[in-house]
Curated annotation (Swiss-Prot):
It comes from Methanococcus vannielii (strain ATCC 35089 / DSM 1224 / JCM 13029 / OCM 148 / SB). It catalyses: 5-amino-5-(4-hydroxybenzyl)-6-(D-ribitylimino)-5,6-dihydrouracil + S-adenosyl-L-methionine = 7,8-didemethyl-8-hydroxy-5-deazariboflavin + 5'-deoxyadenosine + L-methionine + NH4(+) + H(+). Its EC number is 4.3.1.32. SMART domains: Elp3. The lineage of its organism: Archaea, Methanobacteriati, Methanobacteriota, Methanomada group, Methanococci. The gene is cofG. NCBIfam families: F420_cofG (TIGR03550), PRK06245.1 (NF004884). This is 7,8-didemethyl-8-hydroxy-5-deazariboflavin synthase. Consists of two subunits, CofG and CofH. The keyword S-adenosyl-L-methionine applies. Gene3D superfamilies: Aldolase class I. Keywords: 4Fe-4S, Iron, Iron-sulfur, Lyase, Metal-binding, S-adenosyl-L-methionine. Its cofactor is [4Fe-4S] cluster. Residues 35-275 form the Radical SAM core domain. Catalyzes the radical-mediated synthesis of 7,8-didemethyl-8-hydroxy-5-deazariboflavin from 5-amino-5-(4-hydroxybenzyl)-6-(D-ribitylimino)-5,6-dihydrouracil.
Length: 351
């Protein structure tokens, strides 16, 4: 097994020799040369958030809450296009905002989670689409509540270092405290919720902090077995953000992080967002990714609106050029489709 020390040494090295050695190891563990993706619809239920991250443009003071009719319209269109995943997302703890609460009450809901539950339930009852929710920090009871209407859920760890809470990236973001995020990911494991997490590359973290974060994810997965995929997401400069002058991670920096993550995490799928890496995506295929994540024929990436999705044919072409077969998957990985990992009512739709 790759040790923490060896992994940090690899990231610090500027020699090509270790890269070639790692590539040989990756080729020896390649998962049948398959690369997966999920055909999805991105539904930003509300774009207010208690966190003000130095790299994000999703949050808006002049927020919008999507109406149920707006959500239904997207879901029905997505269903007609053959999508199988609905990514429901909103900012963290939106109920802290009194104006958000007032609007939800006018819509007939006590809080945002009650509204989300209703949307997910409608999705399951009226379409072939399966809900996946990523909405920031949730406690044990909230996760348990949403498990009934979600096949999987997600939360980026981002980084396990508390030091970043004092930097421009997270100094105004109480929900980015890694203790809170680790607690939620562990609670999802206790509840047997198939889970997506990941780390951000290029937000001011050190090589050691990157590796520690990957090993923290490994620790949680070894304890609960619930992490189905890990996203290695590169920071991208956006106009007007506090981190506008930060340097984006280089392709080789990302390539090495993908390789080392795959060798550390072994059976967990590794994903790099294809819309953030259109020119370098093939490099990451060589480096060990086995999933492209959600790709939508209908909706944009509301977190990275400047980066359009590649179409499925484009992904297929550059997968095939390296001998990979592109395969569609559900928002829940096949090994989790059983009564231990999914609500019995949802399971009936899948078997």
């Amino acid at each position: 097994m790759l040790t923490r020390e060896k992994a940090i040494e690899f990231l610090n090295s500027n020699d090509t020799g270790p890269i070639l050695e790692m590539l040989n190891l990756i080729n020896g563990t390649n998962n049948g040369k398959n690369i997966t993706y999920s055909k999805n619809a991105f539904i930003p239920v509300c774009n207010w958030c208690r966190n003000i991250c130095g790299y994000c443009t999703f949050r808006a003071e002049n927020f919008k809450i999507m109406t149920k009719n707006e959500v239904k319209e997207i879901l029905l269109k997505a269903d007609s296009l053959g999508c199988r995943e609905a990514l429901f997302t909103f900012g963290e703890n939106v109920d802290e905002n009194e104006l958000v609460r007032e609007k939800l009450i006018k819509m007939g809901y006590k809080n945002i989670l009650e509204y989300l539950y209703d949307l997910c339930d409608w999705c399951l009852s009226n379409t072939n689409i399966l809900p996946h929710t990523n909405c920031g920090i949730l406690n044990y009871d909230e996760l348990k509540y949403l498990r009934k209407v979600n096949v999987s859920m997600g939360l980026m760890l981002e980084n396990s270092s508390e030091r970043l809470c004092k930097t421009v990236a997270h100094e105004k973001s109480p929900g980015k405290n890694p203790k809170l995020r680790i607690e939620m990911i562990e609670n999802a494991g206790k509840l047997k919720i198939p889970f997506t997490t990941g780390i951000l590359i290029g937000i001011g973290e050190t090589f050691e902090e990157r590796i520690n974060s990957i090993f923290e994810i490994k620790r949680m997965h070894e304890k609960y077995g619930h992490i189905q995929e890990v996203i290695i997401q590169n920071f991208r400069v956006k106009k007007g953000i506090p981190m506008e002058n930060f340097i984006e991670p280089s392709p080789i920096e990302m390539f090495k992080m993908v390789m080392i993550s795959k060798l550390i995490l072994e059976d967990i799928s590794i994903q790099v967002p294809p819309n953030l890496n259109r020119e370098t995506g093939q490099l990451f295929l060589m480096g060990g990714i086995d999933d492209f994540g959600g790709v939508s024929p209908l909706t944009k990436d509301y977190v990275n609106p400047e980066a359009p999705w590649p179409d499925i044919l484009e992904l297929e072409r550059f997968s095939n050029e390296l001998g990979f077969k592109l395969k569609e998957r559900l928002p829940i990985y096949e090994k989790y489709i059983n009564e231990n990992w999914i609500d019995s009512e949802i399971l009936k739709k899948l078997i």
